[in-house]
């Protein structure tokens, strides 16, 4: 028996040339369907993906998940994201921010690390850049890790948590630009591109599908 689809009540399964539906409660054993535990875990994580999901909490992915989905991407020609998969995971755990969102934002802003700002300044987000002189104004980081962590802290403190919300290291959020912990909420004060949420979500969806 091979599991094709799974929800709380029903499973779509195949056996040889047959396809049918059975109650989920009947297919909860690895002995009945090898791999069902992992498939169920992945499907539950994927089911949380939504364009309006809250980004001020971890994704639920493991370190191995991060390594898997950020490895062997043809567009990641310099292996920047592959080499920093653990950084995105650790930042997620440390600061309570969805690490897949953060990686997707970096992919979008840097063109998979191919932008001049990303390569010269190890700045995957265009952080600090102004429209009139983006390269000159963008912050320079010593490492990609430093840049990822800096932007994560900045978003947690100013964008995705309400004022006075408890955040990392017993600090409180300023909530300066808070308009909700979602892509649309962030983009309201973060950028001028009205399609920014859609563009970032496209990469989030791509990465979640690689689980």
Label every model-predicted segment.
Residues 7-15, 21, 26-101, 112-211:
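Catalytic cores of secreted/periplasmic lytic hydrolases that degrade extracellular macromolecules
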Residues 109:
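Pyridoxal 5′-phosphate
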Residues 2-5:
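A structural signal for short, hydrophobic beta-strand segments that form beta-sheets
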């Amino acid at each position: 028996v091979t599991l094709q689809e799974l929800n709380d009540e029903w499973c779509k399964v195949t056996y040889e040339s047959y396809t049918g539906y059975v109650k989920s409660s009947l297919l909860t054993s690895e002995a009945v369907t090898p791999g069902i535990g992992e498939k169920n875990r992945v499907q539950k994580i994927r089911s949380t993906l939504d364009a309006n999901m809250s980004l001020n909490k971890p994704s639920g992915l493991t370190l191995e998940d991060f390594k898997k989905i950020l490895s062997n991407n043809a567009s990641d020609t310099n292996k920047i994201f592959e080499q920093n998969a653990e950084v995105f995971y650790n930042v997620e755990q440390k600061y309570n921010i969805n690490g897949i969102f953060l990686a997707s934002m970096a992919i979008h802003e840097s063109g998979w690390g191919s932008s001049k700002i990303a390569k010269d300044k190890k700045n995957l987000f265009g952080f600090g850049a102004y429209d009139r002189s983006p390269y000159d104004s963008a912050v320079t980081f010593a490492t990609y890790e430093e840049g990822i962590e800096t932007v994560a802290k900045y978003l947690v403190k100013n964008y995705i948590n309400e004022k006075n919300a408890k955040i990392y290291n017993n600090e409180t959020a300023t909530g300066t630009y808070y308009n909700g912990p979602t892509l649309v909420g962030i983009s309201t004060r973060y950028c001028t591109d009205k399609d920014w949420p859609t563009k970032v979500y496209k990469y989030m969806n791509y990465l979640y599908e690689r689980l």
